[in-house]
Amino acid sequence: MSFVHLHVHTQYSILDGQSAISDLFARAKELEMPALAITDHGNMYGVKEFLKVAKKFPEVKPIIGCEIYVTRHYDHRLKDKDHRGYYHLILLAKNHNGYKNLMKIVSTGHIEGKYYDRPRVKHEIVEQYSKDLICCSACIAGEIPKAIIAGDMEAAEKAVMWHKRVFGEDYYLEVQQHKTLIPGQSQEVYEHQLVANEGIYELAVKTGTKVVATNDVHFVRKEDGPAHDRLICLTTNAYLTDTDRMRYTQQEYLKSEEEMLDMFYKHPETLSNTLEVAEKIEVFKVDKDPILPKFDLPEEFLADIDTYLERYKDIIDEGRCDKSGNERGEEFCRSVAYLCHLTYQGAQWRYGEQMTEEQAERIEFELKTICKMGFPDYFLIVQDFIAAARSEGISVGPGRGSAAGSAVAYCLKITNIDPIKYDLLFERFLNPDRINMPDVDIDFDDDGRYRVFQYIEEKYGKEQISHVITYGTMAAKSAIKDVARVSRMSIEESNRLTKLIPDKPIVQMEDAEDPFNEGDTLEEGQKLIEKEVEIDDPDNPGGKIKVKKQFKKYKKEVSYKPKLKNCYKLIPELKEELANGSDEVKDVLNYAQKLEGCVRQTGVHACAMIIGRSNLTEYIPICVANDKLTGEEVWVSQYDGHYIEEVGMLKMDFLGLRTLSIIKE
């Protein structure tokens, strides 16, 4: 037998889960588990990182899921105290279509049903997007366990039958068992779980539903429990010494198969059923080639489209098919023709009626490259909103970064720097050998930047536009301060410890060695040493021999980030505190290191915006945030800027440049 954890919270269950994704996979591999799920609370923030880390652990199949919140009433859009209640429910994607449906459910919760920070959906939304999803009944906050604990077996059975009707053989009842071993701590959770489990086993027999054992994982190893307890104190603004605060049982870690079997020895099938679930899951990719928005061409241009298609046939033919040989279609060809039309119009304005041979060849080369790589609409979109900005009197920067190397961008007035005159390379901006999305950073005056946002939203529609999420993590100093606060350490002592943490990298002089080759000379401070090294035996293929070689030994500067691990090793005062400080100081420093790097909050990127081809919830999970200027809710991607382009989305950076505002004023 083996076992798979299907109910797992990472640190993206913000200030509730402590597990680093890489640590989860490493532990799952160590325990020889064939798969591992991610089921964070109401979000998919960590999915891309989860899949990225999974590539390093091919033995462990990644399972994408979410613990969603389902309203107890008929409409998740009702937001008042009488409609605040919700249930927990686990959903797991069987394949890519299931992943898309999961994104729809999670996004709907954030866009329509968010209340008191809980993104809720009604049962009808779950049913609407249920295809290719596996469903588990969740913890004692789930609908079925709650009904059982309340003594309403009729309601529990009714809920089971609803879920079986919706999910069929992909619905599983879920049991958990967390008996705390902490002296003096209440066993209320465990007692409720025992009641719920008894009812679940009864309903499983009565309704023919399989049961899976889970452990509601919130941290990786048993010894991480006290650190997680401090994290919960941060979440609830409590002190460790508070008697009536929220507590976990400290049993919510990634337990081994043996530990799970010890709890569910009377029902070993609950472990083997997790393997059945894992076997239903396909390994699939969520990354895509670029999915650019469709740029609507003007009617007057389309009226004579055949002429333009013929005129620019050579350039169009360069990219008529994608890298797999698939036809890109008529819309693509029309976009290329319009891009060529605008570029050559702009070239006349920039260079005059008669271009030099160098100018003509450069523009044709760039257009063919843009067409071959499939990016004509990108340039059309950028030139459109820059032209709109200028027409509204918004100051636009001359161009920065590698985009200044594009003659096409110069002709389209995206930039105001002639790359031919200044001998700038186009290949730094766009290179056929590296299929990356173009990246044009555009400067606007501060007020104008927001007006450009508005223009794009009006042109493409609110459902195709999104801001980009950011994640704030606990840095070294804040981790010490946070742990010190919940430990009731004095402010003076907390400040004393944090002042020992440098703001800049720690620079050390360390020994280094390099081979000393014939013709080399020793510089000041270097000395020559001789060492025995192992090399390939030229007379014995596959064999090794030892020879003596010369090396130059010297001191070099090595820079370390001021993370707590490095600080404790390299800063004498902190080494002394860890060795001989008070128990309180040692606890604070040790637990701060365990919490350092945990995700603490989300934010919205100040400059980045996503423009999609259609409703963005078809491609990425969405959450919402309040616009700082208007107070209105805006869409925000649940994947951050590192991953947005990997899933095919067009991300643009609109930079507010104070200098432009000053010049304008």
What residue ranges belong to the model's regions?
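Alpha-helical scaffold/interaction cores of sigma-54-like transcription cofactors
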Residues: 1-665
